[in-house]
Amino acid sequence: MINRKLIRIKTVQVIYSYCLNEGRVFSDSQAAGKGEFKEVCRPELVENNLLRSLGTAYDLYNTMLTLMVEISRLALRSYEAQLNRSKRLGLPAPSRKLIDNRFMLQLEGNRQLQENRQNQRIDWSNEEEFVRSIYNKVMDSDLYREYMDTNVSTYEEDREFWRKVYRHIIIDNDSIDSMLEDFNLYWNDDRFIIDTFVLKTINRFKEDSTDEHPLLPEFRNEEELEFARKLVRQSVMGAEYYRSLIAESTRN
């Protein structure tokens, strides 16, 4: 998933921070909220910062996928409440179309996504009020009404519905940007690239996809990981030159 464009962006961020701090980087203990800066004596210290930053980008990818899952779970709870009310009042049962959406059932049951959730910074199940605000936007949207009004239900329609929800409701949402920024200052910088990966992931699901359907890996192959390591190490070796450029620019 992490391509060379994202690697270059993250490398610039890490090296810029390195230069501003006069060659100091965060230690692992400080990243956890304790400890102090350590003077850089080995390029691998900066390399660790880069790999950690890339890891948070992959965390964002999984976080955005699980946001859709949590919206669907809230839809199920709403359906169950409506069903109980309908039974009490002797009314027809509400439509199951949304909660039986075949693509979403695949995504929710995906084993890789379930495993990745263990390491996520945001547990959407603890953010029900926020998730409900997104759910309400979905319920009030034209795309939801159009989806529910169709007479024929196909897998392609189910998948396309969630692709549209992501593209038109989740991507263009300032409240999501604010929420993500509270958890990681750099996540909004990553959103554009990560959003394209989420849409690509949705499109890769097929009607016969099982719970073993692969999501995008953090790195496509070992070559991409080695590229990241080599790029940041070479950048560290030229850090004095880059600091001089920053100093010259700030004087102007």
Residue ranges and their predicted role:
Residues 1-252:
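Class I Rossmann-like S-adenosyl-L-methionine
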